[in-house]
């Protein structure tokens, strides 16, 4: 059973102070991708001010970190799991930012209650920043939730807003380019934060399922995934090769957890 509490020290968070997150059984524990997204917020505080959205907030860690920034006035965290919402509310109180956060039970951008629908309606065109660390989606190439994040965000972001979006290295630059081609209001600017090379740990059933999905996508002619070759640092493996090597050697491929910066223009091309 995972630990029920994660503590991040002040020295990790560039002036945001120490943060503690409770994640009891049945809620989302922090992952390496979560920690990288937290580092992006801590290292790029100057980009965040005003009102924000946290898509798929889980137990609230990214929204809470953003609310520690003095220039951030409020954040709305969107989360489909009731258990996660309850823990997120407790974490906001624990970390002293409850007055700056609203947590909304929602399926993507769609709240489950009329009251919360009215709250979301009041945010249209007024959001200054969006942060999102989506999971891998199922029944597609794993990138579907990231497309959903940007598709739905257009309704809420003001012109000039910024997006911090978690996109792990293995998805490759071609998918990022395609994301901006599909949604031309968004422009990719740079990588805000990245972990060191780390195992895409196939001892985790969820990551093994992801790699199998990636291999199936490549088999259907989809865009190849990108994993560095442990045997030759100048070459890369696609998902099918990485999966075959894992079954042969038991060795997980490598990746980096990353947070990417996009900006938003309501009229593409401005």
Model-predicted regions and their roles:
Residues 140-144:
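Glycine/threonine-rich flexible loop motifs
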Residues 145-159:
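A short glycine-rich, Lys/Arg-flanked "PGG" loop and its adjoining helix->strand segment in the class I
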Residues 33-122, 129-132, 137-138:
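Conserved SAM/SAH cofactor-binding pocket of Class I
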Residues 136-137, 168-172:
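Short "lid" loop at the C-terminus of a central beta-strand within the Rossmann-like core
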Residues 1-51, 55-67, 254, 260:
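SAM-dependent Rossmann-like transferase core, predominantly class I methyltransferases
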Residues 170-178, 182-261:
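Class I S-adenosyl-L-methionine
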Residues 160-167:
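Conserved beta-strand signature within the Rossmann-like core of class I S-adenosyl-L-methionine
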Residues 260-268:
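Conserved beta strand-loop-helix elements of the APE1-like EEP
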């Amino acid at each position: 059973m995972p630990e029920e509490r994660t503590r991040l020290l002040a020295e990790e968070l560039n002036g945001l102070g120490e943060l503690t997150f409770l994640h009891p059984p049945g809620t989302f524990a922090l992952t390496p991708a979560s920690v990288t997204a937290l580092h992006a917020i801590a290292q790029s505080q100057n980009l965040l001010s005003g009102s924000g959205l946290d898509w798929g907030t889980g137990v609230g860690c990214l929204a809470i970190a953003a609310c520690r920034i003095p220039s951030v006035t409020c954040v709305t965290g969107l989360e489909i799991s009731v258990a996660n919402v309850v823990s997120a509310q407790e974490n906001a109180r624990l970390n002293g930012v409850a007055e700056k956060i609203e947590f909304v039970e929602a399926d993507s951008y769609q709240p489950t209650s009329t009251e919360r629908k009215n709250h979301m309606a009041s945010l249209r065109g007024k959001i200054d920043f969006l942060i999102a660390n989506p999971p891998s989606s199922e029944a597609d190439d794993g990138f579907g939730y990231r497309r959903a994040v940007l598709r739905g965000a257009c309704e809420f972001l003001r012109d000039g807003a910024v997006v911090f979006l978690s996109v792990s290295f293995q998805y490759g630059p071609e998918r990022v380019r395609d994301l901006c081609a599909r949604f031309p209001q968004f422009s990719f600017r740079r990588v805000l934060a990245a972990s060191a090379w780390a195992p895409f740990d196939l001892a985790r059933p969820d990551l093994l399922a992801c790699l199998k999905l990636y291999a199936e996508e490549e088999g259907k002619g989809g865009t190849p995934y990108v994993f560095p070759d442990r045997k030759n640092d100048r070459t890369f493996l696609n998902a099918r090769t990485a999966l075959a090597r894992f079954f042969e050697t038991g060795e997980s491929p490598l990746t980096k957890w990353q947070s990417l910066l996009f900006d938003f223009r309501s009229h593409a091309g401005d």
